[in-house]
């Protein structure tokens, strides 16, 4: 309708216009922060909790407006929503605490021409076309809290992807290679455009309460493996995560590390139909002991949490590990220590009211050298016996 063009050409820049367009500024502000016009989080990715709060608020506002046929208001809130999603995946915005690349220059020194120039604008000022022809947007959820949660993960993927373009962009800029400079920016921009399309499509589906059965069915269970834990607020593990056993013990997605160097597929001894077998997990996290992984989850969207917890079938022969799972700080599971070749525990835990889920692995004795702990196939499941909350 009439708001399509303003959404594409004006509202998507709305958070940048809060001081010059008083009429638009309220659509980039939050009730919880009255009087604050410029929300930094709409431009720079923050912690998972902060980003989730922003996604929930602005997606919710847009959905509420569209449900009441306030198309103009919905389009303005949608502009803020897609702006932050695209900025979180823009190479110029994704280096933590270094928006002007002053620290980055120390790692990748520029030629004299750029020695004293803040590089932020140059990293995002290419000339290219963003085309996602043929892309079919995907549904991110059947409720606002669920959709914000799924968009959070996809935005984290966008941030990581954009970080991979920073060095190619700077190398091309330093070398005066305009084509390569534009191409690296374009790659990240197309990723962001697809994410924005997912958000807009989901917004409309939520407002009109229309969900294809296949789309909704695909959201019945969610793999928690690829969500960033709260211990990695900037999507990488800080130094504090590297002080555990064995090796450095830090969380490794999809693998355990032999001697701290060689990735080994996640494998656990499990009991199936009364027999013990070794199961390889494509999805999961390998950790050492003194490990805590904390995940934000949307309240009452998912009914249960399932995971297999144990020692790696090949590397954990001398291990002694205690596994605990906490929800909102209260113990959901406290397993008797797993030792050596003991089979893993398979857990199925209720999640009612829980917004904070912690997976904890600690040493239960020994020297820790065999404490190759595995969280296999951690996933969130909806209650299939009732309709989705909308």
Language model features with spans:
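Hydrophobic alpha-helical elements and their junctions with loops/disorder across both membrane
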Residues: 13-15, 20, 81, 203, ...
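Short alpha-helix boundary/capping elements
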Residues: 85-90, 315
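N-terminal, motif-rich segments that launch catalysis or mediate targeting to/interaction with membranes
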Residues: 1-76, 91-205, 209-216
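Short alpha-helix carrying the canonical HExxH Zn2+-binding catalytic motif
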Residues: 74-86
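Gly-Asp-aromatic-enriched flexible segments
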Residues: 211-390
């Amino acid at each position: 309708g009439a708001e399509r063009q303003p959404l594409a050409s004006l509202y998507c820049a709305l958070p940048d216009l809060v001081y010059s367009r008083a009429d638009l500024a309220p659509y980039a502000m939050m009730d919880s922060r009255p009087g604050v016009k410029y929300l930094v989080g709409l431009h720079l990715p923050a912690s998972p909790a902060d980003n989730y709060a922003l996604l929930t608020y602005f997606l919710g506002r847009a959905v509420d407006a569209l449900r009441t046929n306030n198309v103009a208001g919905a389009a303005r809130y949608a502009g803020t929503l897609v702006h932050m999603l695209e900025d979180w995946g823009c190479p110029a915005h994704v280096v933590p605490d270094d928006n002007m690349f002053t620290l980055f220059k120390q790692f990748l020194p520029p030629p004299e021409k750029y020695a004293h120039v803040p590089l932020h604008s140059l990293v995002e000022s290419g000339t290219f076309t963003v085309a996602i022809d043929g892309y079919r947007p995907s549904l991110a959820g059947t409720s606002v809290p669920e959709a914000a949660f799924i968009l959070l993960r996809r935005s984290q993927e966008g941030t990581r992807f954009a970080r991979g373009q920073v060095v190619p962009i700077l190398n091309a800029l330093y070398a005066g290679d305009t084509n390569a400079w534009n191409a690296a920016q374009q790659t990240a921009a197309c990723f962001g455009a697809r994410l924005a399309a997912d958000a807009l499509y989901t917004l409309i589906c939520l407002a009109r309460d229309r969900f294809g059965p296949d789309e909704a069915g695909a959201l019945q269970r969610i793999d928690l493996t690829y969500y960033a834990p709260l211990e990695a607020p900037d999507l990488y593990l800080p130094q504090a995560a590297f002080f555990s056993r064995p090796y450095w013990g830090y969380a490794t997605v999809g693998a355990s590390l032999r001697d701290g160097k060689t990735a080994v597929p996640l494998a656990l001894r499990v009991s199936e139909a009364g027999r013990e077998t070794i199961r390889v997990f494509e999805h999961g996290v390998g950790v050492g002991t003194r490990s805590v992984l904390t995940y934000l989850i949307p309240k009452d969207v998912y009914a249960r949490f399932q995971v297999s917890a144990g020692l790696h079938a090949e590397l954990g022969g001398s291990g002694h590990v205690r596994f605990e799972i906490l929800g909102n700080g209260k113990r959901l599971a406290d397993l008797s220590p797993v030792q050596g070749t003991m089979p893993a525990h398979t857990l199925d835990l209720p999640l009612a009211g829980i917004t904070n889920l912690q997976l904890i692995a600690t040493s239960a004795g020994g020297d820790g050298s065999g404490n190759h702990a595995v969280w296999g196939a951690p996933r969130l499941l909806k209650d299939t016996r009732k309709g989705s909350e909308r």
